[in-house]
UniProtKB/Swiss-Prot annotation:
Coiled-coil region list: none
Pfam families: BTB_BTBDG, BTBD16_C
Gene: BTBD16
InterPro entries: BTB_BTBDG (IPR056426), BTBD16 (IPR042833), BTBD16_C (IPR048859), SKP1/BTB/POZ_sf (IPR011333)
Protein name: BTB/POZ domain-containing protein 16
Domain BTB: 148-204
Residue spans crossing the bilayer: none
Organism: Macaca fascicularis (Crab-eating macaque)
SUPFAM superfamilies: POZ domain
C-alpha cells in the first residue's frame, strides 16, 4: 500500500476523548468522524433537521471553515444550486456553511427532500471524499431557493458576496459596498458584513454619508451609525456645508449632530448659515449648485412678514433643529441684524437674545443665564491643515478680544491656546470697529475648554483640557490660557474653543 493511500486511511485522535478522524480530509465522507462531531457538539442531528432554526449553525461553520477554508475546489463539482435573483448559482457545501441563511435553507431542503436526511447527508459527504476519478459517482445536487426583496441587493453585489464564500480577500468596490453589505446581511455572513462596515467607515465623505448612515439604521449596525454621526460632527460646517450634498443629510442625523457637545464650527453664526442653507436646499430641490448667502437670505425674506418662517406650517417640523442652535453666541452687530432681517425666528426668540446681550453689556460681559459649558458655551473653531505651521484668528465677545492660536512644532506635535488682546494692540483698527463695543475692564473671568480632534485609521482621537476657570488680564502671564498639547498623525485637526463669562 502506498504511503499516500496509507496516510489517507489512518485515523488520528481528535480532542481528549475517544474521537477519531481522517487527518487529510476531515469530515468529508468519514461517517465515524461525522457522527462523533455531532456528538461532541451535543447536537441531535435528526432534531436539528426538523427544526433548522434551532441549530447553532456557527458550531458547524467552525468545522467547515477550518477544514475547507483554503481548499482548492475549482475542479470539484458543485453539490448545491442556489436559485436567486433570476440566476442559478453553483455552490459547494463546505463554503455554503459560512452563511447561516444558506445553511438553514440547505438543511430544510435536506429534510424535505428525503425520508432519511442523515443518510442523504452522509452520501453527499462521501461523494466529496478523495477517490479515483473512475470510482466517483456524481453527487446528487441539492436545489435551494432564496427570495430577496431588498432593493440594495444587485446581481453584481450578490455575486461578490458569494465569491467571498470562497476567497476571503475579494476587493469590495465603493460603488458596490452597499449592495454587498445588504447581501451579507441577508446571507447572515458576519465576516463579510463586518468587512463592508469597515470599508464604509473609512470612505465617509459628503457624497456617501447619507446612504451609509441610512444603511446603518436599516441593518441596526451601531458601529456604522456612530461613525457617521462622529464624522458629521466634525465636517458639517467646514465640508458638507459647502457642497450640494448638504441637501441629502437626514433630519434625524442632523438633530443628533446639533445636540452633540463635540460639534465643530467656526462660530455660532457660521453654524446658523449652514442650517439656513440646509433648509433652503430642502425647499428648492431643483437647485444643483450652492447659492450665495444673499440668495438664501432673500428667499426667507420673501415670505409674508406677518408670520416668521418657523411659525409657518412648513417650518413647524424644523423647530427642534433650530432650538439646538446657540443664538446667544451670535454677538456681532451685523450678524444680529441678519437674524431680524430674514424673518425666520419667532419674535420671542429674538427678544430673549437681545435682552441677554443688553444685560451682558451692562454688567461687564457677565453671562448670567449660561451655566453649562457643554450645552451653552459660545464656540469658535480652527481647522488646522497640513500646510499650517502657525494659525490664529481674532474673536471678540462683549468688547473682550481674544486670539485663538494653533502651533505645529514638528510633524506630529501641536499646541493650542487662547490669549486676551488689548484693543490698542490690534493689528488692524478695522477689527476693533467691526466688533465694537470695547471693554476697558482689566480682568475678565472666563470658564473655558479647548478640544482638539483628529481622524487616525478610521478612529477619532480626542484631546481636551479640563473645564478651566481663569481670570484673563491684559498682561502676561494672566492674558494666556492653559495650553493644550497633543501628539497625533491625523490631519486636519479640528480645534474648538468653548467658553462662557461667569458673573464676576
Amino acid at each position: 500500500m502506498s504511503n499516500t493511500h496509507r496516510a489517507r486511511l489512518e485515523r488520528r485522535i481528535a480532542g481528549s476523548t475517544n474521537r477519531w478522524r481522517f487527518p487529510k480530509q476531515p469530515f468529508t465522507g468519514d461517517l465515524l468522524s461525522l457522527s462523533q462531531m455531532f456528538k461532541a457538539l451535543s447536537i441531535d442531528f435528526e432534531e436539528a433537521l426538523r427544526n433548522p432554526d434551532r441549530l447553532y449553525i456557527s458550531q458547524i461553520q467552525k468545522f467547515f471553515c477550518e477544514n475547507f477554508k483554503n481548499k482548492d475546489i475549482q475542479s470539484a463539482e458543485a453539490d448545491v444550486i442556489l436559485e436567486c435573483l433570476g440566476f442559478k448559482w453553483e455552490l459547494h457545501q463546505p463554503q455554503l456553511f459560512q452563511s447561516e441563511t444558506l445553511a438553514k435553507l440547505y438543511l430544510k431542503a435536506l429534510m424535505q427532500g428525503t425520508t432519511y436526511p442523515l443518510r442523504e447527508l452522509e452520501e453527499l459527504l462521501r461523494a466529496q471524499s478523495p477517490k479515483k476519478t473512475k470510482e466517483k459517482s456524481p453527487a446528487k445536487r441539492m436545489i435551494i431557493s432564496l427570495k430577496i426583496n431588498d432593493p440594495l441587493v444587485t446581481k453584481v453585489a450578490f455575486a461578490t458576496a458569494l465569491k467571498n464564500l470562497y476567497v476571503s480577500e475579494v476587493e469590495i468596490n465603493l460603488e458596490d459596498v452597499l449592495g454587498v453589505l445588504a447581501s451579507a446581511h441577508i446571507l447572515q455572513f458576519s465576516g463579510l458584513f463586518q468587512r463592508c462596515v469597515d470599508v464604509m467607515i473609512t470612505r465617509l465623505m459628503p457624497s456617501t454619508i447619507k446612504n451609509f448612515y441610512e444603511a446603518g439604521c436599516k441593518y441596526k449596525e451601531e458601529q456604522l451609525t456612530t461613525a457617521c454621526e462622529k464624522w458629521l460632527e466634525m465636517n458639517l460646517v467646514p465640508l458638507v456645508g459647502m457642497q450640494i450634498h448638504l441637501r441629502k443629510i437626514p433630519q434625524d442625523l442632523l438633530h443628533k449632530v446639533l445636540k452633540s457637545p463635540r460639534l465643530f464650527t467656526f462660530s455660532e453664526f457660521r453654524l446658523l448659515k449652514t442650517m439656513l442653507l440646509w433648509v433652503f436646499l430642502q425647499l428648492n430641490y431643483k437647485i444643483q449648485a450652492i447659492p450665495t448667502h444673499e440668495t438664501v437670505m432673500t428667499f426667507f425674506k420673501s415670505f409674508p412678514e406677518n408670520c416668521c418662517f418657523l411659525d409657518r406650517d412648513i417650518g413647524q417640523s424644523l423647530r427642534p433643529l433650530f432650538l439646538c442652535l446657540r443664538l446667544h453666541g451670535i454677538t456681532k452687530g451685523k450678524d444680529l441684524e441678519v437674524l431680524r432681517y430674514i424673518n425666520f425666528f419667532p419674535e420671542s426668540w429674538l427678544n430673549r437674545v437681545t435682552a441677554n446681550h443688553y444685560h451682558a453689556l451692562e454688567n461687564g460681559g457677565d453671562m448670567d443665564q449660561l451655566k453649562d459649558l457643554n450645552t451653552q458655551a459660545v464656540r469658535f473653531g480652527l481647522l488646522f491643515n497640513q500646510e499650517n505651521t502657525t494659525y490664529s484668528k481674532m474673536i471678540a465677545v462683549y468688547g473682550f478680544f481674544f486670539k485663538i492660536t494653533g502651533l505645529r512644532h514638528d510633524t506630529t506635535s501641536y499646541s493650542f491656546y487662547m490669549q486676551r488682546i488689548k484693543h490698542t494692540d490690534m493689528e488692524s483698527p478695522f477689527v476693533v470697529y467691526e466688533h465694537k463695543p470695547v471693554s476697558l475692564r482689566a480682568a475678565r473671568l472666563v470658564k473655558y475648554e479647548i478640544r482638539a480632534q483628529a481622524l487616525v485609521d478610521g478612529k477619532w482621537q480626542e484631546f481636551r483640557t479640563n473645564q478651566i476657570m481663569q481670570k484673563f488680564g491684559l498682561t502676561k502671564p494672566s492674558c494666556k490660557s492653559h495650553i493644550l498639547k497633543i501628539q497625533t498623525v491625523g490631519i486636519p485637526i479640528y480645534v474648538s474653543f468653548a467658553f462662557i463669562f461667569p458673573p464676576s
